[in-house]
Amino acid sequence: MKNCLNICLPVLFAVFAVALARGQNDQNEIQITRPVSSLGNTRPIPVSIEGFDSEVTAILKFDLYVQGFTFVSPETAQYQISGSSTGSVVGRVVDRFGKKTLFSRSYNGATLRRQAHALTDDIVFAITGKKGIAQTQIAFKVQASNGNGEIYIADFDGHNYQAVTHDGTIVSAPAWAPGRSALYYNSYKRGNPDIFYHNLTTGERDDIAHYTGSNISPAVSPDGSRVAMVMSESGSPNVWVANANGSHPRKLTSTSEDSSPCWSPDGQWICFATKIHERRVLAKVPAGGGEVQVIRTPGTPNPTEPDWSPDGKWIAFTMQAGEFDICVMPADGSAPPVILVRGEDPSWSPNSRTLIYARRTGGHYVLSLLDVYTKQVKDIHQILGSDSEPAWAR
Amino acid sequence: MKMMKLVYPMTLVLAVTLAATGCRNHKPVGVTPIPNGQGGQVGELPPGGTMGGNQPGGGQQANMQEFENMTEDRAALANYTIHFAFDSSAIRHSEDANLQSVASALSSDPSTKLLIEGNCDERGTEEYNRALGERRALAARQALAKLGVDPARIRTLSYGKDKPTDPGHDESAWSQNRRDDFVLLHPKTGA
C-alpha cells in the first residue's frame, strides 16, 4: 500500500499538471484511447507489373510482396513497373502521381532470376530509399524424419539452395559470421553437441566448442569478433562468450535456464531467454559482463528465441503459449509486444522489417517470410524434409 | 470552469493507469536489474578446462578426452530410463528406483562411466528444447551424485526433441519422449 501511494501521488500530480496545461489550450475532454500498436498498420504500396514473362513476374511479385508492396492495375497503381525479359531483363518504374520515370535500366548477369532480383532491389530503393533484400542469403537446417539433418544455405527466397554439411548427423542453429562467407552451427558429428565454424569458401571447418555437456545456439557479434553460445560445462546451461575462434570462453550468466542468445546490433548487449523468479522471460546482459536485466514482454508469456533487428529498434521472439507465435516489440520496452503470426524462431532481414521464421504444418516445418509493417506473409520455396532454424545473412 | 470539467476524466485516467500498471511494478518498463547472487561477473573456465583454442580443432576440454575410447552399451540400463513432467527438469520421486538402479550399476563396476542423454517432447521451440534436454540430463547427474556416484564419471548431452521414442502427437507419446536415457560406457579393451 505504501508503494501504491509512492506511485499514486506523483502520477496524480503529473496527470493533473498535464491536465491543467491542456486545459489552458482546448475545451475538449481528455479521451481515453487504447494504446496503438507500436508497429502501426502500414498499408502496402500499390504497384503494377507489366511486360515480363511469367517467371520473372513471379519473382518480382514475390520480392516486392514480402517488402510491403501489393499489386494492382496500372490505372490505380502508385508506381507502374514495366519492362521485358526476353534475353535479359529490362525494367522501368514510373511514379504515376508525380508523372515521372524513376529509372529505366537493363540488366545482365548469370540468370534471369538474378537480374530480376537486381531489378526489385532497384525498385525498392527508388521508391522507399531503403536497400532491398532480394540479393541476400539465408542459412537453415533441413531435417529428416530420423532426426538427422544438414545445414543449407540459399537465396532468401529458398532458391539456389545448397547443402553445407554432408555428415548425416544432428545439426542445428546455423548463424552467419557477419561480413564473411562463413557459418557457425551446432553439430553432433563428434558424438556430442559441439559448435563448429565453417568457412563456406574453402569448406574448412573447426569445432570451436567441444566441452562436456551441450554446446549449442551460437550467435555471432555484429563485428564478427566474438561468438555467444549456451554451454553447460559448468553444470547448467548458461550464456558464454568467446572469441570468434572459440578462445577465451567466459561465462556471462548464472541464471538457471538460459537459451537462445542474440546480440544487439551495437554489440553491447546479449539478449537471451531465461527463467527468473519462476517466470520465463527475456533478459539482456552486457556483452562484457555485468548484471542481467529482465526485458518485460507484457501480454506475451514464455518468450523465447529472440532476435534483435539490425537497426536496433525491435526485438522479435517466439511466444510459447500452447501454440507458437512470432511477436515483435520495441527494443527499448516503450510499448508492449505485438503478436503477428503463428510461427517460431524469427530472424531479421537486413532491412529490419522482413522476418524469416519457421511454421509447423503437417508434422514438419516450412520457412516463411513476414513483413512486420504490412503483416504480409509468404512461404519461401521449400526444400525436401523439414526446414527450420533460419538465419538471415547480414 | 475548465478545472471542474477535467477532474472527472483525470481521475478516470489515473484509475486506468494504476489498473494497467499495477502498484508493484514501479520500475521503468523493460529494465529490471537482477541481483546476480552467484556472481554476475565474467568467469573463465575452471582450472583443468584448458583448451588449445588457438589451434585448429582446438577447444577440447580435458574432461571430454576422458570419455573418448569407450564403447557404448545402450542395453545395460535401457530399462531405467527416467521421465519428466512437461517443461520441467525436476526429478520426480517416481523415478527414484530407476536412478538407484543406475547408481548401483555404476558402483558395481568402477571402470565404467555414464552418458546421460536428455530428451524433450515436440511441444517446445528447437533451441529451448535443446537446452531443456540438457537440464534434464544434468538433473539426473546431480541426483546420481547424491546417490554416491562421482559426477566426473558422468557426461551429459541433449537431443532436444530430435530423437523421440514415440513419433505420436498426443500426451501418451509426449510423456514417453520427455526422458533421460542412460548409456553405460565401458573402456575399450585390447591394444
Tell what function each PLM region has.
Chain A
Residues 8-17:
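Bacterial N-terminal signal peptides
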